[in-house]
């Protein structure tokens, strides 16, 4: 499973002063506001942002990759990805993906958020070759808010929140790869889940 190493320790490091005083950590919410995170949400936001950084790294290494879901979990995070025919990600590929993630972190990219009307959201995802995101938009209620987070060249449909800059992600480790059916339905395509 892909996890932030010692996530609880890292979360405390991000929000604790060496003398034990709290240091506020801000997150970017989908309404565009940057607000201080409650302490119990810090680990989740770090993990969620790490999933986006991992997806960006995979997209840089595998430009034809098509992404489905990439949530934070209780133990880390993952992203489900559809790779072109004949292309597979295995644990042998983890060092290259982790190296690209480290580059993205070092670039200190700012997370930004924008809301789009349904037609524009679909057009954006179609233009980027993200068929699973288009299907997800189609499944949303007509009055749903559709927001996208961007860091650098990478854009992902997401409700957030996220860290403000990629440099806030201090440590991570790819730990596994498995298969996962799109939407958890065995009648759908098997995707690659990277943890």
What residue ranges belong to the model's regions?
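Active/ligand-binding-proximal structured segments within catalytic/core domains
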Residues: 41-61, 72
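Auxiliary tRNA-acceptor-end handling modules of aminoacyl-tRNA synthetases
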Residues: 4, 10, 23-46, 66-69, ...
């Amino acid at each position: 499973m892909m996890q932030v190493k010692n996530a609880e320790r890292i979360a405390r490091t991000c929000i604790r002063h060496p003398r034990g005083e709290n240091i506020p950590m801000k997150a970017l919410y989908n309404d565009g506001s940057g607000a201080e995170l409650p302490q119990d949400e810090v680990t989740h936001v770090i993990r969620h942002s790490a999933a986006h950084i991992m997806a960006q790294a995979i997209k840089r290494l595998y430009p034809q990759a098509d992404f489905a879901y990439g949530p934070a979990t209780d133990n880390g995070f993952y992203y489900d990805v559809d790779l072109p025919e004949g292309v597979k990600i295995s644990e042998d590929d983890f060092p290259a993906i982790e190296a690209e993630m480290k580059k993205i972190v070092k670039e200190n990219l700012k997370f930004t958020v924008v809301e789009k009307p349904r037609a524009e959201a679909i057009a954006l995802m179609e233009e980027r070759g993200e068929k699973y995101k288009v299907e997800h938009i189609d499944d949303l209620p007509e009055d749903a808010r559709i927001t996208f987070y961007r860091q650098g060249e990478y854009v992902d449909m997401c409700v957030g929140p996220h860290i403000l800059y990629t440099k806030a992600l201090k440590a991570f480790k790819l730990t596994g790869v498995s298969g996962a059916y799109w939407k958890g339905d065995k009648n759908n395509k098997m995707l690659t889940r990277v943890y």
